């Protein structure tokens, strides 16, 4: 069986790994101890985890974050979410074919077992950037705090990010890679004995007696906090289209989990729908992992993410199709191709513009929804509850850090442990970091063709200025000295060519042009984060401008070849400075190296698989767009009634994925949303084995 592990990565450490054996449908396979079952299956090129009882549709990964139930498998006789269940030596794993059988339990319930109860001044749910930052402020104030997270390491989505972060160096570790920021925050927190962290601990409900129920190591525990902070992050949104639940269609965050956290080569060729930062960054991460990106498709006329992120992809040879959408994912058992089409002014696909890409994976990156059910229920029960990060408002992780700090200080102040005023600068910086990117502007290249000088290829105001902090001569500033101002250099004759600005830039948008040795053919230093292969000294490279257009060499000079590769592994790990000699008239245009071939598509496909009404809305119960539309047109205005008619939203995930789409369907049908009754949310918010609540002991004495 083919093994799909990432064995070499330009940023992440890929060292030797211990292996364990497990079985999948009676076949012996190998995995890493402690990795999630889903990742072990993907690493063994298995993406179909079972078949749905309603229509025998193949089931596989979608969220990789415990938010849906599509990755269900049977592990040692018990149905579990494969993305949340660690692999063990000798584990027997089976696909779920239809309705999972009820596991045999020989041990009787412990009628007298005691539920552990714990009272704490502060409970924080979620150890991502917001939760960690809040805990740090509470730790500094000496507030006894319990921080819990359902993963086996702190950091939240920071763990998945290999790119360098934006913001400022002093406030949000700008220029440092996301996973390293998570480690920094976690290490800082260990200095405070008053903060206790429980990992592998899942909050499952908030109750009317102001108790938060959690499951830790198979045991049910009740926690009664004076103050509750919900920092649970976000979950990925989905799109309705035929084939949208085929194995191979999953969220961009799930892809980053597989590729960056678990070092699984989850795909050979992907197509991405969604041109926000999440989708564009996922495309870059794919290329770092050796995965081809066929294209990025965005419904708007312009990408919603930072232009420097989009520019990085286009320079590498990835086409970005704006005003396009996905029409269908095609395949019998898994994704074999994806059909896209151009959108008209009414957001309808234009007939005849269909284009089909042969890919094995379709990444969905069409936005995020707040994981705020714990916050809303706590408010309903009158708890003193706070909210931070994406659970409060979807924004960048750097903004979540500020949000967490602010809420941490508010909680400390409410407990009388902080008597100062919360700095207004925190709120102001948080708002800046949440702000939308500005409109791209045209900028002229700097004048002069002597000495050595930086060239800034960023044309859009975004909150980012690490280049101003690393210049040894303090020559780099931003317009109006604001974090969103475009950078520029002064007194460039003083530049010594240290290359720090090239290496630190999160957008890889700074080059250095050195005329000192040969003014006619200066040396251009380019940032590069894809490893040394293909850019070794003497390698022939295809250079590109900011828009991804090829910068051709002059016929008299021949090919562009790499002159030298420089690395500062200690200060800027993972970033290479590739030096190439370029004609002076082109030197300030050059910014990238193309590694992918020109776009290849199958052409038009006027008959994509399936009809729009076949799109699955409710993954758990396989409720389709057509069934839900029919009920709405028959007069249904209550989502609870929809559950009774066609089971939409009735599944074990608690409508986490389908709920936003249900509201959109009502809106698309012309129904005023104030006329629609929302579903009633009840505990539990997360699936919990009955044995945990009954005190049933397993074979090894665990709950």
PLM region spans:
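Acidic (E/D-rich), amphipathic helical modules within compact regulatory domains
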Residues: 455-458, 462, 466-512
């Amino acid at each position: 069986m083919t093994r799909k592990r990432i064995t070499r990565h330009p940023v992440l450490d890929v060292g030797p790994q211990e292996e364990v054996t497990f079985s999948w449908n009676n076949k012996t396979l190998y995995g890493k101890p402690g990795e999630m079952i889903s990742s072990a299956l993907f690493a063994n090129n298995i993406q179909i985890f079972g078949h749905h009882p309603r229509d025998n549709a193949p089931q596989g990964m979608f969220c990789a974050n415990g938010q849906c139930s599509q990755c269900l498998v049977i592990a040692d006789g018990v149905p579990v979410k494969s993305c949340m269940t660690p692999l063990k030596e000798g584990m027997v794993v089976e696909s779920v074919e239809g309705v999972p059988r009820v596991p045999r339990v020989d041990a009787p319930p412990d009628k007298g077992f005691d539920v552990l109860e714990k009272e704490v001044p502060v409970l924080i749910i979620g150890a991502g950037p917001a939760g960690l930052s809040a805990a740090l402020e509470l730790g500094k104030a000496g507030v006894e705090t319990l921080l819990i997270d359902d993963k086996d390491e702190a950091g939240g989505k920071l763990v998945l990010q290999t790119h360098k972060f934006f913001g400022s160096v002093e406030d949000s570790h700008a220029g440092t890679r996301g996973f390293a920021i998570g480690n920094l925050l976690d290490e800082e927190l260990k200095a405070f004995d008053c903060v206790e962290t429980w990992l592998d601990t899942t909050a499952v409900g908030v109750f009317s007696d102001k108790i938060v129920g959690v499951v830790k190591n198979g045991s049910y525990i009740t926690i009664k906090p004076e103050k509750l902070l919900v920092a649970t992050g976000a979950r990925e949104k989905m799109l309705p289209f035929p084939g949208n639940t085929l194995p191979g269609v999953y969220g961009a965050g799930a892809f980053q989990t597989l590729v960056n956290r678990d070092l699984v080569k989850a795909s050979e060729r992907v197509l991405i729908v969604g041109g926000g930062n999440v989708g564009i960054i996922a495309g870059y991460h794919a290329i770092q992992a050796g995965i081809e990106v066929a294209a990025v498709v965005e419904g708007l006329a312009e990408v919603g993410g930072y232009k420097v992120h989009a520019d990085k992809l286009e320079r590498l040879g990835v086409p970005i199709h704006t005003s396009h959408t996905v029409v269908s994912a095609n395949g019998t058992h898994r994704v074999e191709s994806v059909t896209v089409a151009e959108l008209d002014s009414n957001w309808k696909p234009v007939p005849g513009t269909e284009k089909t890409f042969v890919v094995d994976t379709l990444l969905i990156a069409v936005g995020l929804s707040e994981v705020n059910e714990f916050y809303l229920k706590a408010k309903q029960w009158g708890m003193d509850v706070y909210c931070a990060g994406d659970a409060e408002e979807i924004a960048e992780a750097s903004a979540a850090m500020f949000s967490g700090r602010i809420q941490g200080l508010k909680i400390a102040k409410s407990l009388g442990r902080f008597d100062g005023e919360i700095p207004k600068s925190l709120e102001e910086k948080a708002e800046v970091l949440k702000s939308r990117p500005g409109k791209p502007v045209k900028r002229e290249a700097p004048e002069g063709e002597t000495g050595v000088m930086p060239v800034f290829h960023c044309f859009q105001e975004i909150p980012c200025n690490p280049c101003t902090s690393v210049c040894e001569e303090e020559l780099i500033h931003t317009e109006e000295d604001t974090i969103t101002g475009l950078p520029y250099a002064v007194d460039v004759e003083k530049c010594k060519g240290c290359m720090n600005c090239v290496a630190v830039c999160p957008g890889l948008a700074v080059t250095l042009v050195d005329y000192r040795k040969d003014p006619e053919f200066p040396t251009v230093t380019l940032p590069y984060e894809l490893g040394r292969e293909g850019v070794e000294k003497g390698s022939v490279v295809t250079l590109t401008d900011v828009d991804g257009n090829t910068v051709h060499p002059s016929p008299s000079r021949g090919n562009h070849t790499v002159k030298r590769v420089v690395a500062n592994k200690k200060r800027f790990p993972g970033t290479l400075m590739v030096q190439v000699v370029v004609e002076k008239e082109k030197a300030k245009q050059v910014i990238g190296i193309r590694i992918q071939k020109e776009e290849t598509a199958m052409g038009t496909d006027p008959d994509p698989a399936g009809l729009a009404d076949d799109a699955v809305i409710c993954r758990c119960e396989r409720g389709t767009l057509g069934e839900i539309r029919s009920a709405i047109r028959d007069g249904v205005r209550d989502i609870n009634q929809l559950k009774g008619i066609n089971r939409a939203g009735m599944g074990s995930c608690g409508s986490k994925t389908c709920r936003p789409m249900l509201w959109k369907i009502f809106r698309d049908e012309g129904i005023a949303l104030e006329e629609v009754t929302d579903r009633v949310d009840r505990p539990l918010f997360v699936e919990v084995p009955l044995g945990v609540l009954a005190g049933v002991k397993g074979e090894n004495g665990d709950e």
